[in-house]
Amino acid sequence: MSTLTSVSGFPRIGQNRELKKIIEGYWKGANDLAAVKATAAELRAKHWRLQQAAGIDLIASNDFSYYDQMLDTAILLNVIPQRYQRLAFDDQEDTLFAMARGYQGDKGDVTALPMKKWFTTNYHYLVPEVEPSAEIKLNSTKPFDEFNEAKSLGVETKPVFIGPYTFLKLARTPEAAELEIDKGLVNAVAAVYAEVLARFNDLGAAWVQLDEPYLVLDKEPGDVELFKALYTKILPAKGNVKVLLNTYFGHIADVYETVNLFGFDGIGLDLNEGREENLEAVAKYGVAAGTTIFAGVINGRNIWRNNYATSLGLVDALKQVTADVAVSTASSLLHVPFSTEGETGIPAEDLKHFAFAVQKLGELKEIAALTDATEDEKKSSAALAANQALFDGTRVAADPAVAERIGKLSDADYVRQPAREERQSLQREALGLPLLPTTTIGSFPQTKEIRAERAKLRKGEVTKEAYDEFIASQIDAVIRKQEEIGLDVLVHGEFERNDMVEYFGQNLNGFLFTKNAWVQSYGTRCVKPPIVWGDVSRANPITVEWSAYAQSKTDHVMKGMLTGPVTILNWSWPREDITHEEQTKQLALAIRDEVLDLEAAGIKIIQIDEAALREKLPLRKSDWHAKYLDWAIPAFRLVHSAVKPTTQIHTHMCYSEFNDIIRDIDAMDADVISFEASRGDLVVLDAIHDARFETEAGPGVYDIHSPRIPSEKEIEDRIYEILDKIDVKKVWINPDCGLKTRGNDETWPSLEHLVAAAKAVRARLDK
């Protein structure tokens, strides 16, 4: 029997971001919901047929979503808070969008659900909110409709779901006690999943995949019991359906024995990010009779070609224990671009080293064929020989100057003088800012006009001089507007930047860039990460010209805006031939040069965004420092350690949970940190208070990822919440992220309310 191939999930936005465009058109009133549904159906059909044509045996369905799979699961379970139900939309899709984005209109005014990073990826999920009054029941036919839709096209699929354990661990539940065994919530959720399996049994599904990535995290007391309680109630309902328990982003060595003996028909193991531990667990505990191990050998989170020899070795190690091995993607392919087809800007000799989602289907099929081949067939395999050739030679020459510079670093290069308390006093005197200074995070709306002008430059339809004049006019206008509404510290708007990572990559040695390699970040928001191809260094100043120009146009303090080394790496496709630590150190030196040039140009506040610092923190706490923080935090200090005491260093962090690493963040030795907090209900404030956080802080006072405009009173209330926990002298007032993706009609009223709220609070404090 041939080795089975399985894909955990496929990108849903479309090869040319068709889903993004049609949904955003719907939000703007340019097309109706029927057009959205039609485009979605076309994309699903295309993606299923692609996988079928590639020879994939177990093709995913229900991996499609208009916004987010966790949100879909909440709706499936009827976990819809009353505030959204009261909007009384006719279409469930509109309820979904209100939960994701908030809503402000004739039907009411509600904020969006909280949004967090999906484990260690740059994908964001909506956090389900289970109210005490929630009536858990099967509330959607989406999974069954899409299964039948595929079947009508002649494609047999494997429905995919977020598993109940992961859902409950990530959701906001009424109280921790609700997760005790035999409580109503656990039983109700299990009953819905049991009903889902029973329905798929009636529909004739061969396999159903339940994703339980939360199993790769450290276990808290009661976690294993919760898992057992759920699946004890769910699995008896499966009938003839085979259930694949799929895990990814790490290992499940600490629960493998339990999972193995539980009666699952398949267990999916990540052999990229949990390789050694997962293999050791299988070797130690074996594989239960009737259980197939799905070997996750295809990396679903990077774009480099798979090393077939390595993958075959992993499969062979499993086959020493069991003959029942399938080959699979290590995670959903949601996290990689669609296809390398059309990437003509990258030389063919370089492009051959990359595999996007479509190419990974081919890799999966070739690995399966090689798994079944005899040793003689492997020796004569053209596919194996061509693959091995990619790894035999030197892909790119090392830069000796970069290595030499790193070799000369000393401990002193990672320490800024004098101590922060002394710097704060000097900076307050030098900057002369009021109490509760107001600012923004950096970017302002990138209008159609701005994007069109950039496209013209790219196509050669305007000269660089004309483009620069246009950018200067945009900067002039945004400075005037910031001055008019009364912001204290200004920014130049970043109109010259297409993306906070790609822009820097384009001005550094060692990067490659794609034309269409988009991946979903959240909802319709897509990003196009650059590729770290070789050693990194700065060729020329990157931001100095525009920052200096902006400062020359105002008497206010102008922030210089940079992206930090950890974030550049985490939001790029990193190399796999050298460590992340080494790549980050190279980036840190390049950005350090930029910091010093900005300071020399008269920029008094320099913001070094580390939006993605928390994102790649290992999922198990025992790995946090040795495998990440011990080099990530020093890399940030290396960037700014040489500036003058009076130069104020800011940083910014995005959707992350900071509470557990708050002391490490303080150790970055920035002078000010702003961070997204509005969707997290400012829970980080307690951690800041308890840790006696020394860095000045700007917790975001409103959510920029929602189109709704916060009232002045709403922001005032937020400020008072902040002042309950943080010394007023250390508080900054700002939105929770950059404003690039918002419209001007939302941005300026929101900022006017922000400034008015800050002034009102100041006035009360002065009395």
Curated annotation (Swiss-Prot):
Give the protein's cofactors. Zn(2+)
Binding of L-methionine occurs at I441, G442, S443, E494, D609
Query: Where is Zn(2+) bound in this sequence?
Result: H652, C654, E676, C737
Q: Which UniProt keywords apply?
A: Amino-acid biosynthesis, Metal-binding, Methionine biosynthesis, Methyltransferase, Repeat, Transferase, Zinc
- What is the catalytic activity of this protein? 5-methyltetrahydropteroyltri-L-glutamate + L-homocysteine = tetrahydropteroyltri-L-glutamate + L-methionine
Q: What is this protein called?
A: 5-methyltetrahydropteroyltriglutamate--homocysteine methyltransferase
User: What would you give as a GO molecular function for this chain, any one?
Assistant: 5-methyltetrahydropteroyltriglutamate-homocysteine S-methyltransferase activity
Give the binding site residues for 5-methyltetrahydropteroyltri-L-glutamate: R17, E18, L19, K20, K117, R525, C526, W571, E615
Pathway-wise, it operates in: Amino-acid biosynthesis; L-methionine biosynthesis via de novo pathway; L-methionine from L-homocysteine (MetE route): step 1/1
What remark does the entry make about the cofactor? Binds 1 zinc ion per subunit.
Concerning its family, UniProt says: Belongs to the vitamin-B12 independent methionine synthase family.
EC code(s) of this entry? 2.1.1.14
What's the source species' lineage?
Bacteria, Bacillati, Actinomycetota, Actinomycetes, Bifidobacteriales
Any one Pfam family match given in the protein's UniProt record, by short name:
Meth_synt_1
Its biological purpose is as follows: Catalyzes the transfer of a methyl group from 5-methyltetrahydrofolate to homocysteine resulting in methionine formation.
EC main class here is: transferase
Q: Which residues bind L-homocysteine?
A: I441, G442, S443, E494, D609
One of the protein's GO biological processes = methionine biosynthetic process
Residues annotated as catalytic? H705 (proton donor)
